[in-house]
């Protein structure tokens, strides 16, 4: 049996069978899709970016974003449920920050690359490092597929 064959051969070669097999397993793409869905909202991107730099409580986030606390809480709940953020309670206050995982750190770097802004703690400087970050993010996001 010849395996998967495309209707038009453009001479690109490659491992089309492997690519096709991955494409047909749509469940593999669900986690990445959910993360990108969360980051499709500009307010959530702003919150994620800020909380990648520091832990904050809802009241301070609302002040920084010039939004109501309930509106901020709505976004925080969604980002936390998706695994992008983590929270901790200290008395009556709940503090939020970006989850401390390699994937979340890479998403933070991607957000900064797309926005062309530098993280206050460091600056990403070269095209080569940008490409390395993108490759690393791809590898991390598809590692468990």
Q: Where would I find each of the regions flagged by the language model?
A:
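Generic detector of contiguous secondary-structure segments
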Residues: 72-76, 92
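Intrinsic low-complexity/disordered segments
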Residues: 71-72, 127
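C-terminal regulatory/oligomerization modules of transcriptional regulators
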Residues: 1-28, 102-145
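Alpha-helical residues within the helix-turn-helix
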Residues: 63, 74, 80-81
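Beta-hairpin "wing" of winged helix-turn-helix
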Residues: 80-90, 97
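N-terminal helix-turn-helix DNA-binding core of bacterial DNA-binding proteins
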Residues: 26-70, 94-102
């Amino acid at each position: 049996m010849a395996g998967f064959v495309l209707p038009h051969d453009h001479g690109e070669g490659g491992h089309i069978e492997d690519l096709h097999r991955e494409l047909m397993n749509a469940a593999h793409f669900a986690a990445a899709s959910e993360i990108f869905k969360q980051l499709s909202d500009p307010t959530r991107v702003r919150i994620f970016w800020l909380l990648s730099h520091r832990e904050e409580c809802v009241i301070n986030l609302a002040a920084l974003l010039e939004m109501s606390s309930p509106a901020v809480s709505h976004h925080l709940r969604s980002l936390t449920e998706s695994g992008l953020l983590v929270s901790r309670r200290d008395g009556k206050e709940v503090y939020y920050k970006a989850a401390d995982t390699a994937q979340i750190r890479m998403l933070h770097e991607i957000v900064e690359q797309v926005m062309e802004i530098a993280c206050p703690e460091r600056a990403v400087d070269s095209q080569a490092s940008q490409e390395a970050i993108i490759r690393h993010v791809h590898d991390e996001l598809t590692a468990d597929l």
